[in-house]
């Protein structure tokens, strides 16, 4: 595989593949040759530095890297998360065909469907008012308490599908900072609030600390007996959940073959289901399942996750780009960049290969972003004229949900397309100078000012276009990026499904708590940590 990477590097250099502007000038049909569609979802990658030769080499790279074989292992329940000896089967959670999926010889689909049915029954009960609070009032507010995958997915998807909300209001608490839960509790009434505690082990310190605060909120206002009417849990630790005071009928489980950052499809999606209803949640699963089938069956040049993953690898390990910007032109996708940040960086932020040797080249990039057009007035300046090349990924729907605001949506579309065009085309010195002199500036001053108005262009971008951000479309988009991360992880030769860096942070925080509380000396820690503990201790009131 290293030989192919070297060949890609030499081919990119020899063909001047990074001159995207010249490629468009030479080929009027470039868009049609370097774009692909799956139903209404269009992926335009013509503004990246690829050509026919590079695509052929990338296809060989996927073959030599064993992407197809590893893909089938994942879908069939092989324990590809070998450091934890676990299968990776978030795809089973949205397996709408109900084709058997075996883990250790057992079909998991009956259990998956059983939990989904229980979620639907509970969600319907809350939404209809059949399941009430302790005083007999209907639930009007749902607060999900979780962190990481137990928070980012539900937050992102619930916000994204706001036009489909017809259930109780939704809130989310994640940070152990007491300000987070305090600010939200001010907005709700104990009598009409349901808390969902999302923690597989029911031991996550941030989640359980906030859960205890929520429990105190209910018990203080309504009494201990009210707790069972105002809480539900997504967990597998039934004994701990029972000790907390949550009825077993309100506990929804999931499995160790579901990673946190892939868990929105599981019972972790309960707050989303309550917000939009079981039918729309089912359409959300349908969209992801459709992308799963596309990923498994579509030929290379039509396979969106395969193309996206290979171009991502090409940007990272051939052209050396260290970061990628996620730029959805949809305010309701405002948390999508953060969601992808966890999905990508927690999965592919690894330095050791599946053989236990150091990664050669690079692993995952830094992933970040904001919705357009907000980002245009913040960091786009650096993307356009900075010294680092940052591949951008735009997303735009053809239609919004506010027909009376169609003109605003057209402005949004125009801004999105203009940014991708500007990144590719740039502006030469001659063009900049001509623009200045046409406005009356003299030649000498124009020569001085024009360099500041030069844009080098050749900044790569990918643009996704789709009809409308429906539950189906959102599920499809998330699954597309999940599979993109998978493809890149296989090519990086890493395990994309563990997260030992996260575990390290938990261990160290647990060890430091007694020091922060003043129960133990800081002497065993480095001088910086000792100094910081002392400074904070001095400021405590």
From Swiss-Prot:
Localization annotation: Cytoplasm
Family annotation (Pfam families): PGI
Principal location: cytoplasm
Annotated function: Catalyzes the reversible isomerization of glucose-6-phosphate to fructose-6-phosphate.
GO biological process: gluconeogenesis; glucose 6-phosphate metabolic process; glycolytic process
GO molecular function: carbohydrate derivative binding; glucose-6-phosphate isomerase activity; monosaccharide binding
Catalytic site positions: 346 (proton donor), 377, 506
InterPro entries for the chain: G6P_Isomerase, G6P_Isomerase_C, Phosphoglucose_isomerase_CS, SIS_dom_sf, SIS_PGI_1, SIS_PGI_2
Pathway in which this enzyme or protein is active: Carbohydrate biosynthesis; gluconeogenesis; Carbohydrate degradation; glycolysis; D-glyceraldehyde 3-phosphate and glycerone phosphate from D-glucose: step 2/4
Main EC class the enzyme belongs to: isomerase
Species per Swiss-Prot/TrEMBL record: Rhizobium rhizogenes (strain K84 / ATCC BAA-868) (Agrobacterium radiobacter)
Protein family per UniProt: Belongs to the GPI family.
Keywords, alphabetical: Cytoplasm, Gluconeogenesis, Glycolysis, Isomerase
This protein's name: Glucose-6-phosphate isomerase
Assigned GO CC terms: cytosol
Reactions that this protein is recorded to catalyse: alpha-D-glucose 6-phosphate = beta-D-fructose 6-phosphate
This enzyme's EC code(s): 5.3.1.9
Gene3D superfamilies the record matches: 1.10.1390.10, Glucose-6-phosphate isomerase like protein, domain 1
Xref: HAMAP family: G6P_isomerase (MF_00473)
